[in-house]
């Protein structure tokens, strides 16, 4: 048996193999050590010939659904090796084979999957001129592809968040250099990533002559990535994939660009703080699993075209204004369940009888939804109603053939209703009317023998038998055969009982075979409805999301935004959708107005003390814009949203010191990416840029960036720039579309009260020392800090730092270039040369410290 194990293990050496032995799944050798640690099961040893032993750990086969998810979540690939024949029918070693390879990206097990999110497998192909990418969720059948530069593929990887990524063997350095090392990855042989093999695989799967019908024919690199995914499904023994019915192109030009920094800093999907909330958490009132998954997708793919946005808003408004319609849809959605994943299980042959019944219930619930949508005074709802397919024939067949409360597994029996098959009914009559028949035999034999206490019973050793107490054993007929002697009784069998037993047991076996055949035929018939039911699932998910928007709007007092094809962003009394939900009971969120356009107020510089709410104001502006462009109502009194095509944020950078990048380097990298990609329709948020360097460096860089955005000849991006550099307020005097605002505070009796209201004009104070006092800083330190602050302010006034030089900078911005080194001292020249030749981007922290030590030695003359 161990040879059999080793032969099968050699096919997938990197996977943990669950080896079926009777009623247990066993693991051996290093697999056993891994399984014991992850699953918390006992690690033992078994003899392995010639005095050797091998590690072993196992669990009962019925506990697979409990233990398999734990292995997958631990990032393991799991090969399930089952017995391919009944041990009772063979005297040789039981034939075994790998029936499924479950990986983080390839699973249809409900216990592995999260019902609120997709479980995507991705493949990346590094082409000569572009990078191809494909995504597949085998649990839903969604199959998508795209190609483009590395930054676009990086954005897709972060927005789709695949559980596993495939790429060509030997390309790990290229992958991690462009996309990082946070993903679970797997390398495949180079032949998998060839155009000929991929195209052939796709054409064979879709049974087409070309891929033009999918709109991906021109995506050479995307086709290669897509084909690699299908090859991987074969390798993992997932060959029944009839639910993968199309390959769709991810249309980049339809969606707002959100990079990974923006998704993270705006906390769209998850919070950056433990226990914090996200925008998704606030607006997700979906009912169905499909709706929850689609909403998560919408969050990171906002629309940028006016018509589809208004189509969504029209439906949300209809829900909002029609409470009876809303309640009807809500009630029916609660009955539908995970229609999308159930129909996928039909294709792969893993659908249970209970799931088939749930599918029937879902189809029944769709009927009133379809009727209501078709009758609604709303074109978008009418179109949804038209696309919903009642699948009446299969729905009625399920109703006719499957019991309403069947067992979970077909081999438990009792799945098929009475009256479906004559032979099945007859067999059931034989098998399940046994009690009456046995009672008649018992009564007859008792009367014939005169033994009143005679009884007929059954056990697995002797089958049916007659039990007679010792008091009456002299009355037993000679034709009875004694099988067992007990202390107070004897047990006998008769020819009649033996024949009846064979008849009953044969009937039970035949019932199971017949029920399985009838059920399989039904599932095969159901598979013909996969495309129609997938469309149903998509439309139900869409309705669910829009209903969720309406319920959130009603609950939180949101209004419908006005979507306009211009450059004006005019939000009146806007609120932060997440923060307002976290306020203590009775506390009201302080709403604010924000106006940005390309004519008079393109850039707003926001100053104000720490903790005043500058960052919240920036984020709320972006979140309101994003909510509007996914088709949701927004938290404001009114909102005119001039369509945005990109949202950029530079809000808070976490040090990446492990790869040699400081806070400042991260800031500059992110700022550079923004400035190289802005357009006239972009919304740009900068929060406290330049904190990671010296004050004057920070002011200079911040000034230059704001000036660049304002003076850009083509892309006048709408920008909010929050800063503690009050010197930037000088820019309003020299740049006509820059305006100063501040988040107001009030100082009473040497205490600061945060009013959190955006007001016109700059701010002169940061109140940092007041914040330190509020944080519980020792009084002696606060006192000393005030003394130092007064001295510094006095010195600056005397030296004229705050005003004149910056005004001169704005006047001489044409051809000014700073000279960093104007030195004559040879030692300083040597230091200059050392610094200028440093490759800062690739310098690690340890190397930086060593270089600093070298410079120190130069200064000391050593």
Curated annotation (Swiss-Prot):
One GO term describing the cellular component: cytosol
Keywords on record: ATP-binding, DNA damage, DNA repair, DNA-binding, Nucleotide-binding
InterPro entries assigned to the protein according to its UniProt record, in alphabetical order: DNA_mismatch_repair_MutS, DNA_mismatch_repair_MutS-lik_N, DNA_mismatch_repair_MutS/MSH, DNA_mismatch_repair_MutS_C, DNA_mismatch_repair_MutS_clamp, DNA_mismatch_repair_MutS_core, DNA_mismatch_repair_MutS_N, DNA_mismatch_repair_MutS_sf
Gene3D superfamilies xrefs: 1.10.1420.10, DNA repair protein MutS, domain I, MutS, connector domain, P-loop containing nucleotide triphosphate hydrolases
Molecular function GO terms recorded: ATP binding; ATP-dependent DNA damage sensor activity; damaged DNA binding; mismatched DNA binding
SMART domains recorded: MUTSac, MUTSd
Residues engaged in binding ATP: 608-615
Family, per entry: Belongs to the DNA mismatch repair MutS family.
Alphabetical list of HAMAP family matching this protein: MutS
Function recorded in the entry: This protein is involved in the repair of mismatches in DNA. It is possible that it carries out the mismatch recognition step. This protein has a weak ATPase activity.
Protein name: DNA mismatch repair protein MutS
Species of provenance: Bacteroides fragilis (strain YCH46)
């Amino acid at each position: 048996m161990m040879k059999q194990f080793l032969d099968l293990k050699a096919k997938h050496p990197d996977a943990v193999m669950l080896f079926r032995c009777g009623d247990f799944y066993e693991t051996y050798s290093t697999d056993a050590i891994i399984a014991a640690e992850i699953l918390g099961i006992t690690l033992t040893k078994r003899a392995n010939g010639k005095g050797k032993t091998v590690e072993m750990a196992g669990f009962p086969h019925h506990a697979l659904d409990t233990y398999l998810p734990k292995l997958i979540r631990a990032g393991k690939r799991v090969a399930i090796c089952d017995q391919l024949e009944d041990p009772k029918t063979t005297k040789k070693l039981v034939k075994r084979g790998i029936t499924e390879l479950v990986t983080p990206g390839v699973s249809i097990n409900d216990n592995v999957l999260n019902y609120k999110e997709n479980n995507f497998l991705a493949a990346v192909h590094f082409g000569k001129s572009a990078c191809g990418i494909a995504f597949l969720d085998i649990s839903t059948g969604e199959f998508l592809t795209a190609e483009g530069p590395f930054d676009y593929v990086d954005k897709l990887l972060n927005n789709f968040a695949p559980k596993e990524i495939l790429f060509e063997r030997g390309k790990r350095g290229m992958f991690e250099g462009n996309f990082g090392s946070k993903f679970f990855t797997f390398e495949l042989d180079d032949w998998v990533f060839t155009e000929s093999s991929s195209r052939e695989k796709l054409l064979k799967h879709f049974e087409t002559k070309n891929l033009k019908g999918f709109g991906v024919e021109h995506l050479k690199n995307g086709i290669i990535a897509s084909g690699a995914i299908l090859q991987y499904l074969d390798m993992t023994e997932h060959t029944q994939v009839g639910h993968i019915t199309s390959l769709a192109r991810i249309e980049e030009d339809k969606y707002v660009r959100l990079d990974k920094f923006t998704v993270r800093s705006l906390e769209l999907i998850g919070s950056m703080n433990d226990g914090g909330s996200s925008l998704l958490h606030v607006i997700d009132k979906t009912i169905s699993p499909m709706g929850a998954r689609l909403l998560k997708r919408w969050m990171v793919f906002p629309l940028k075209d006016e018509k589809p946005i208004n189509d969504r808003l029209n439906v949300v408004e209809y829900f909002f204004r029609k409470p009876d319609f809303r309640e009807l849809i809500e009630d029916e959605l609660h009955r539908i369940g995970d229609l999308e994943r159930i129909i996928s299980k039909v294709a792969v042959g893993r659908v249970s009888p209970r799931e088939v019944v749930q599918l029937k219930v879902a189809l029944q619930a769709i009927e009133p939804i379809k009727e209501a949508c078709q009758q609604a005074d709303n074109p978008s709802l009418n179109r949804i109603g038209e696309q919903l397919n009642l699948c009446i024939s299969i729905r009625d067949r399920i109703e006719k053939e499957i019991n309403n409360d069947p067992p979970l597994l077909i081999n438990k029996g009792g799945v098929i209703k009475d009256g479906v098959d004559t032979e099945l009914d007859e067999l059931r009559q034989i098998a399940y009317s046994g009690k009456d028949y046995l009672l008649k035999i018992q009564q007859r034999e008792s009367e014939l023998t005169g033994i009143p206490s005679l009884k007929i019973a059954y056990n697995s050793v002797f089958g049916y038998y007659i039990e007679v107490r010792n008091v009456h054993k002299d009355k037993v007929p000679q034709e009875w055969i004694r099988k067992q002697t007990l202390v107070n009784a004897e047990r006998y069998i008769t020819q009649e009982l033996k024949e009846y037993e064979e008849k009953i047991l044969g009937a039970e076996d035949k019932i199971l075979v017949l029920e399985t055949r009838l059920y399989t035929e039904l599932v095969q018939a159901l598979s013909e409805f996969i495309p129609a039911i997938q469309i149903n699932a998509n439309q139900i998910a869409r309705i669910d999301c829009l209903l969720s928007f309406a319920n959130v709007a009603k609950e939180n007092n949101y209004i419908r935004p006005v979507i306009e094809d211009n450059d004006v962003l005019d939000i009146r009394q806007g609120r932060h959708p997440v923060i307002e939900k976290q306020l203590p009971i009775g506390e009201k969120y302080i709403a604010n107005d924000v106006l940005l356009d390309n004519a008079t107020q393109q850039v707003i510089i926001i100053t104000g003390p720490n903790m005043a709410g500058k960052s919240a104001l920036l984020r709320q502006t972006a979140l309101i814009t994003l909510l509007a462009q996914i088709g949701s109502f927004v938290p404001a009194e009114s909102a005119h949203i001039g369509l945005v095509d990109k949202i950029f944020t530079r809000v808070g950078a976490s040090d990446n010191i492990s790869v040699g990048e400081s806070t400042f380097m991260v800031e500059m990298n992110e700022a550079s990416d923004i400035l190289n990609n802005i357009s006239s329709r972009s919304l740009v948020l900068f929060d406290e840029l330049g904190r990671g360097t010296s004050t004057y460096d920070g002011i200079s860089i911040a000034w230059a960036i704001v000036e660049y955005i304002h003076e850009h000849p083509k892309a006048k991006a709408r920008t909010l720039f929050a800063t503690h550099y009050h010197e930037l307020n000088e820019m309003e005097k020299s740049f006509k579309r820059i305006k100063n605002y501040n988040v107001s505070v009030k100082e009473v009796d040497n205490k600061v009260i945060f009013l959190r209201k955006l007001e016109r004009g700059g701010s002169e104070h940061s109140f940092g020392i007041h914040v330190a006092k509020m944080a519980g800083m020792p009084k002696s330190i606060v006192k000393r800090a005030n003394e130092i602050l007064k001295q510094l302010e006095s010195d600056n006034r005397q030296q004229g730092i705050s005003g004149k030089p910056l005004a001169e900078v704005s006047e001489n911005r044409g051809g000014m270039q700073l000279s960093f080194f104007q030195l004559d001292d040879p030692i300083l020249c040597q230091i200059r040369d050392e610094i200028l030749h440093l490759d800062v981007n690739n310098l690690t922290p340890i190397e930086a410290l060593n270089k600093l030590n070298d410079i120190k030695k130069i200064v000391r003359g050593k």
